[in-house]
Amino acid sequence: MIHLDTVTKRYGRAYAVQDVTLTAAAEATTVLIGPSGSGKSTLLRLMIGLTRPDAGTVTVDGRRLTTSTAQALRQRMGYVIQEGGLFPHLTGRANAAVMAHHLGWPHDRIDARIEELVRLVQLDPDRLSQYPNELSGGQRQRVSLMRALMLDPDVLLLDEPLGALDPMIRADLQDDLRDIFRRLGKTVVFVTHDIGEAAFFGDRVVLLREGQIEQTGPMASLLDAPASPFVTDFIQAQRAPLEHLRTEDRE
């Protein structure tokens, strides 16, 4: 579980996050959604300790995330970003195992974990000998997911992991990701700007606006009982193009 208590983060005079209190529950997927600049990625970086709050506290399973505890707590978290963040000079296998090598795992332990993970993420084992520029976008994200899961973390954080993929690859990986989340039963925090992804993955959805929480709850509550005109407009803005196309088809 991750808990943020009245967390604020500023860059200069601008607030990226302001007075946010939020809990990402264990064995559930919390989706952070909102327009660009609403604070989604900043919140994720605060949760993993890559940036420090100017005010408020972040705790992971009851332990406060500070400069002195960040490294140890970060080993209990896996992190996936939009483009994968793989090292271009390393093979897929070496990328997946980079943290295990850093911690001095023996080769047989690494081999066994790689074998487990390649089955879990449904990646062709032959792809592990290739470099990132030889892999498709979906394959790179599967390797990135292997790396995030290598140490069997308690928490998995994903920052728009599907955003750069073409629609067919995205659909396949989306199905596989949800299956993985359900099977592993970890605390998952998933960032997206897409309400379809939020509905697909989220046990709980947190809609952000200018660094603050506008509404939170199951996706159905945002759709059926929007808390403000902003919530209505945000949802309608993503529905409108599809409705426009349906109207044209009927005509």
Question: How would you label these PLM feature ranges?
Answer:
Residues 48:
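Helix-to-loop junction immediately C-terminal to a conserved catalytic motif
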Residues 64-78, 102, 108, 222-226:
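ABC ATPase NBD coupling module
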Residues 131-135, 139:
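Conserved ABC ATPase signature
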Residues 210-212:
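Conserved ABC ATPase "signature" C-loop
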Residues 216-217, 225:
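ABC ATPase "signature
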